[in-house]
């Protein structure tokens, strides 16, 4: 974000507050394009493109998204990024949760970095590899000029030897990758099935390691559900 120094940013929301915080340091204006509940929080690409006509130069997407657990399919991403390329809009896609998607290849934008120079994809080890304390992340872009400029301004010693060693071991541990996907995806499907049996909840399609619910019982709050989970009632 600092290297791109955007002037007018659109954020696909609701989502992390950290994007907004980082943008505040760069001086960019920022607005949200909110996913709609009536669409199960899936993106209307054509509608978003109409909004992007209003002079934005930077677009931020979390895919799969937190907190909706919804995802944008790769073909829709291609259409969106191509539109942005024609409008000189740079697209940043955070794929922190992509390893939890039922079909990673259907969701990831990484292959699109070979097609578009206005794209950067971010990933990390905090969620799937359960290592938030490592503070280890990486970016993928096909824009060599942009990459060179980022390297010029890279903080010295931004990756320590422990992080480099652990990160390599994590990303090459294919057995962990397979077993973790089997466990999380299996448990998520089981949870979705059981929750759908309860009329008090509306269950939205999930692509991350969490499920978004709408409470449909009058007087029942999220705090009540939380306490029921803690004491084993639910």
Regions found by a protein language model. Give the residues of each.
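Conserved PLP-binding catalytic core of the aspartate aminotransferase-like
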Residues: 184-185, 195-232
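PLP-dependent aminotransferase class I/II
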Residues: 20-21, 118-204
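Phosphate-binding glycine-rich loop
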Residues: 1-8
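Substrate-binding/gating loop at the entrance of the active-site cleft, primarily
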Residues: 11-28, 157
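Helix C-cap/helix->beta junction micro-motif
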Residues: 26, 86-87, 116
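Active-site phosphate-binding strand-loop segment of PLP-dependent enzymes
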Residues: 31, 39-101
């Amino acid at each position: 974000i600092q290297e791109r120094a955007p002037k007018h940013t659109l954020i696909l929301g609701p989502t992390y507050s950290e994007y907004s915080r980082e943008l505040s340091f760069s001086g960019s204006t920022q607005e949200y394009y909110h996913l709609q509940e009536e669409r199960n929080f899936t993106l209307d690409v054509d509608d978003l493109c109409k909004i992007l006509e209003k002079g934005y130069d930077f677009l931020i997407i979390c895919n799969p998204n937190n907190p909706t657990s919804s995802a944008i399919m790769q073909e829709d991403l291609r259409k969106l990024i191509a539109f942005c390329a024609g409008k000189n809009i740079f697209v940043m896609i955070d794929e922190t949760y992509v390893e939890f998607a039922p079909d990673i290849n259907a969701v990831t934008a990484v292959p699109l970095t070979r097609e578009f120079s206005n794209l950067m994809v971010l990933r990390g080890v905090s969620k799937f590899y359960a290592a938030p304390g490592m503070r280890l992340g990486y970016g993928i872009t096909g824009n060599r000029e942009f990459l060179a400029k980022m390297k010029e301004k890279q903080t010295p010693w931004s990756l320590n030897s422990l992080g480099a060693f652990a990160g390599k071991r994590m990303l090459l541990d294919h057995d962990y990758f397979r077993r973790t996907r089997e466990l999380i995806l299996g448990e998520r499907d089981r949870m979705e099935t059981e929750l759908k049996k309860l009329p008090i909840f509306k269950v939205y399609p999930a692509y991350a390691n969490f499920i978004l619910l709408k409470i449909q019982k009058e007087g029942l709050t999220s705090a009540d559900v939380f306490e029921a989970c803690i004491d084993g009632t639910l």
